[in-house]
Amino acid sequence: MFDVYFGGEYLGELDEKQLIEKAVEYLQPVKLIDVQIASIKEEINQLRANLTSIGAIDYSKDRVTGGGTPQGLEVSVSMFMDTVAERDKRIDELSKLKCDAITKIDALDEKLGAIILRYEFVLNNSTEDAYKMIGCYSTKQAKRYKLKALLEFGRKLVQ
């Protein structure tokens, strides 16, 4: 059991299993960050494509006319710019979360376990593939290193 303090306030005791759960709870969302960022970038690209098509050329008339600047285009552009700014802010938040996780993993004393955590949670490899990255250790040994690293990670989260 470990006493947990947050901001000088006593929060109670956590056992090893709870500390490991806290570490996994923190790291699990990190696995999806690259996918989330890619989808946000795709969303921004689609918004840009939609924006450029607002002033499209009208071929349905006898005389071809350009889209010009229809009334309300300024509002659409403004909304687009606001949405892009929001999405860019979300990308920054996700990037910061990933960088924080990397920094915390790098600070672990359990280096073999840290390698496993990096491959599994930061680089989004399967657990089995992450175990292989530490070299000639059995799966059982690799699991122990991972659990030691998760326990250390959990302790550092609650300190």
Protein language model regions, located:
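DNA-recognition helix of helix-turn-helix
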Residues: G135-K156
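N-terminal interaction/assembly modules
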Residues: M1-A107, Q159
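Short, conserved sequence motifs enriched in acidic/basic residues, glycine, and aromatics
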Residues: A107-L108, C136
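Short amphipathic alpha helix immediately N-terminal
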Residues: L108-N125
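Hydrophobic, well-ordered secondary-structure scaffolds
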Residues: E93, L117-R118, K146
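N-terminal positioning helix adjacent to the helix-turn-helix/winged-helix DNA-binding module
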Residues: L97, K111-G113, Y145
